[in-house]
């Protein structure tokens, strides 16, 4: 086979692959909504945390929804906003089924994350996302232990600065 025939074959194959990808991307079908039931788990059974309006929220408040809890903090430079944006994209990609997904952002930095900051932060990703804030370090520690979440305050280079 000569070089010209090989290039023509590669070109045709590339066009076929690209065309297939475009057809799949243009499909009106939404991804199927699947969840894992953790009802029998011995962890993450419940919580009682304040939302930005001061109401105590529990897992029962979200009955009938699939709950995606994310532990983070509003001063997080990269991972937290990326994950929240991905949760918003997942919810949007589910179309009408997205109403069944409840994203909950739990701060691991109640020292800096005020109720106002939390509300602004989560609603920037989706107005239906909920932010919750432990009252103090003891409540945060107990919650993290129950949900098997690790967090640690790491002092920064300048006085008073830190990351989680």
Regions found by a protein language model. Name each.
Residues 13-21:
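Bacterial N-terminal signal peptides
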Residues 82-143:
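Structural microenvironment flanking redox-active thiols in thiol-disulfide oxidoreductases
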Residues 24-25:
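C-terminal motif of bacterial Sec signal peptides marking the signal peptidase cleavage site
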Residues 47-67, 91:
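A short beta-strand-turn-helix
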Residues 138-164:
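Thiol/disulfide oxidoreductase modules built on the thioredoxin-like
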Residues 38-41:
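Start-of-domain marker
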Residues 60-83, 87:
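Short active-site neighborhood of thiol/selenol oxidoreductases, capturing the structured segment around
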Residues 3-11:
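N-terminal export leaders
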